[in-house]
Amino acid sequence: MDIKRLDVSHIDRLWELQTAYKAEIGEDAPGEPERARLAEAIQQGRIAFYGAWDADDLIGCCSVTAGFSTFDYAPSGVFEDFYIRPEYRHSGVARRLVQYAYRESGVSSMTVGCADCDIPMYQALGFSVPLGNLLAYGG
């Protein structure tokens, strides 16, 4: 298994995982406009994606969007888009991918917003500092 940062040349493989993730959680599949916006964001460096590969197969991905936090007055990242193909789960891929994304993104901390049912998984992966509630504003 190899883990590396993804770029816009990987958009087809990444899009397969994005679509599989949305299907697994019961959301509508994203369309071509969303794909184009994602490719543009990757191209412009507004989001960093990392991928786990088994030979030529992209088997897992995650993203880190960097910002600055007064939590520790250093670069921080929002960890999202985490998906491991079902047949590769519980094999260490997730842990390696999280560790790689943290190291390579250059952030001093990463936060994740997740469903209650996913809290034990994220805690097992090292997300252990509770920061209260995470709410999204949609304007």
Segments (PLM) and residue ranges:
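Conserved GNAT-fold acetyl-CoA-binding loop/helix
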Residues: 15-39
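Conserved acetyl-CoA-binding loop of GNAT-fold acetyltransferases
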Residues: 123-133
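Conserved beta-strand in the GNAT
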Residues: 51, 57-66, 78, 83
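Conserved acetyl-CoA-binding loop-helix of GNAT-fold acetyltransferases
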Residues: 84, 90-103
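A short helix-loop-beta-strand connector motif used in the catalytic cores of GNAT acetyltransferases and
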Residues: 39-51, 78
